[in-house]
């Protein structure tokens, strides 16, 4: 009962679980996840909320993994809980994308959580991180190099992700389960030194406890709490410096001191769980002061990009290659062009709000509108006599270089009339069949 009081206390402090919540729980069948669900079931006597379990078989441990999967299914059945199970070939994916098993496992895990989250209409994801995980994460980040924000450990509440047992030690969890004869599975890889975190758990912490201080973990957790309080008191409000697309607005931070800028950058990266050291923060700070569009790799998955007005994080993808592809849209029609859905509709009501993603064109019924990417020498008309190279338009408009080859360009009668999201051109009047001209509304929606 003492442990449950700790859970209640933590829940009250951080508002982790409330009435009418729908919670997706990561369930491995191990002691931590079993203990988490047992505590959540007890919390249902105090709050009205739903629980759904998610189990992932990473196909790394053969029969052991299958045994865990079967146990998870039976546990859910016994406790009248709905469970979603998925098998993911983590080793094959890691080899294909050039990432570690841990990285791929984490990415695929949260990807599946998100899928189930949408399916059941959840508003929270609960993970079974315990107090030992907090301490191991602190040491792992300290060894690799990180910021003060990184040394906070694993956040108890991070947007929609909650960790209700994150202040309970593993030994107390095991003692509770064994005392109450609650079954669980043991992942044998937790006792192997193949993964860095396992090595910290199995070697480093026991060595320090035995040689220097038996209460080492308590001391580290006290330090984590102190760092959290310090960060909370000193941290800037990130939302004051970012736009609706979560990009840092450079104009708003130019008068901040270097100290505040670096703190802001740490907060900015930490929200995506990107771990970087002090040198990388210094490098990004120098990037902010430079001219033009530049970027820096953060890790295997992300890079940070500075353009003329913003600083933002982007996911690394395969290099984008321009293809000589032309999509021809008959008036009226609708078609997908890579990451864009393009609709061409005839309109009679001319009182249409002007939107950035729309173009109102005079054209002939059944004529063709072409869509493609830019080509060498492309020009756009500014008025009846003057045109300009699209390359120069991009420079004038300060369009980032990596975006210039991704913007759809629209042509009618072989003349460019619109660079999507950048510039609308002057269109000469059509002399022939002018009486048959109709109003055509072109709408572009990004579907990626």
Curated annotation (Swiss-Prot):
SUPFAM superfamilies xrefs: Adenine nucleotide alpha hydrolases-like, PheT/TilS domain
Top-level taxon of origin: Bacteria
Entry EC no(s): 6.3.4.19
Binding site for ATP: 28-33
Domain comment (free text): The N-terminal region contains the highly conserved SGGXDS motif, predicted to be a P-loop motif involved in ATP binding.
HAMAP family given in the database record: tRNA_Ile_lys_synt
Family listed: Belongs to the tRNA(Ile)-lysidine synthase family.
Protein name, UniProt field: tRNA(Ile)-lysidine synthase
